[in-house]
Amino acid sequence: MFPRSILLALSLTAVALGQQVGTNMAENHPSLTWQRCTSSGCQNVNGKVTLDANWRWTHRINDFTNCYTGNEWDTSICPDGVTCAENCALDGADYAGTYGVTSSGTALTLKFVTESQQKNIGSRLYLMADDSNYEIFNLLNKEFTFDVDVSKLPCGLNGALYFSEMAADGGMSSTNTAGAKYGTGYCDSQCPRDIKFIDGEANSEGWEGSPNDVNAGTGNFGACCGEMDIWEANSISSAYTPHPCREPGLQRCEGNTCSVNDRYATECDPDGCDFNSFRMGDKSFYGPGMTVDTNQPITVVTQFITDNGSDNGNLQEIRRIYVQNGQVIQNSNVNIPGIDSGNSISAEFCDQAKEAFGDERSFQDRGGLSGMGSALDRGMVLVLSIWDDHAVNMLWLDSDYPLDASPSQPGISRGTCSRDSGKPEDVEANAGGVQVVYSNIKFGDINSTFNNNGGGGGNPSPTTTRPNSPAQTMWGQCGGQGWTGPTACQSPSTCHVINDFYSQCF
């Protein structure tokens, strides 16, 4: 994952805890209902979400003067990191008006660009247990299920849902006074340096504004921790990826230990062991009108299988299942020379994939699947986000990457997006209507969160990719280059040409 990752809060000093709380705007967390499930059924949990601290207004205590404007610090308020943390406060958020975040029942909608007094790009939110603590998920021998609508996410965008090994209180007990209520304590496996506050000090020393992002920059420090990417996706490509670290919890890095000169110098695995169906050789599995049809909402099931079938076992396998239109769809099978034809992430899969693609073995060197399992056992925070990529334009997800390699080389092609796509200036300028919707989050015992009707339990069974009737159903594919399925539509819908490759019934 290559996210814009920003952490505010954390201080180990006893004199003053870093990152204060502002009083200019009340903080009202949007509600989000989700479910805990067992073989007996599912029970509602009345949850809430909070906005990551980095998106929030950061101002001088007791007035309205910005501590940080654009991508620069005010050095009169922030002459050094310690003083800055003592002087600056986080404030409440206007979720819908400023950030384009709305919730309704079990659904959370994140708009990519929101125009208010200023232009906001993207967002990152965390599921809360209460108003002061994040919900902690222990995922071993469990499954996590959610619905997602990526139909309005084009090339270059990423609707990412993942877990991060953050502190439940956002560091409030030891490092700051704002805490999880205000979205503090973020970290991930990229050891991001675009974090404004870390270990109770502003990351202002050595800070340089980004040359292509008016809101971000990088400082001397970064925040590292384990990350389990359940879902990184747009309408063209998707991937799920474990990223282990050598040490538990949030670890601060500095200089080259934050990958300043060497991507693989950190304590965490930046690459992960990813399963992207397109990259793994099935180029007709995921996308508009494909087996998993991104024109429609998708139910995504991820299972964390242990070696002894108990919560105390060792992580052995990470499985992926989809449900769409009441049908269970098994994950695509690998079709790459040198990799066994499976459809899940295991230690063997990761070893073979790294060898077949010629990738660095940073995943194995940081503990591999066992290391990821340890983080899952300790507990992780759920992150829901939408973002674009100012580093490499999201090509690692949906196009050819790296660009200096031949697309014919195994592992280079990850999707059908153009090599010129995903530039932030383009996707941000053409962002009308771009959004992601997450809904129906469920967590519980294996096979308790879904069945052939999309919920409730039962063992998965495979489905075909084409309807049995001679006419296509409403919203189904009815034409396009290479299409061999039905070309007539069930009444009252008719077939409409969307592009050369895809026609749809509506």
From Swiss-Prot:
The active site is at residues 227, 232. Residues 460-470 have a biased composition (Low complexity). The keyword Chloroplast does not apply. The keyword Signal applies. It catalyses: Hydrolysis of (1->4)-beta-D-glucosidic linkages in cellulose and cellotetraose, releasing cellobiose from the non-reducing ends of the chains. Residues 470-506 form the CBM1 domain. Residues 406-419 have a biased composition (Polar residues). Disulfide bonds join 478-495, 489-505. Residues 1-18 form the signal peptide. Residues 19-450 are annotated as: Catalytic. Residues 405-426, 449-472 are annotated as: Disordered. One of its GO terms (cellular component) is extracellular region. The biological conversion of cellulose to glucose generally requires three types of hydrolytic enzymes: (1) Endoglucanases which cut internal beta-1,4-glucosidic bonds; (2) Exocellobiohydrolases that cut the disaccharide cellobiose from the non-reducing end of the cellulose polymer chain; (3) Beta-1,4-glucosidases which hydrolyze the cellobiose and other short cello-oligosaccharides to glucose. PANTHER family: 1,4-BETA-D-GLUCAN CELLOBIOHYDROLASE B, GLYCOSIDE HYDROLASE FAMILY 7 PROTEIN. This is Exoglucanase. It comes from Agaricus bisporus. The lineage of its organism: Eukaryota, Fungi, Dikarya, Basidiomycota, Agaricomycotina.
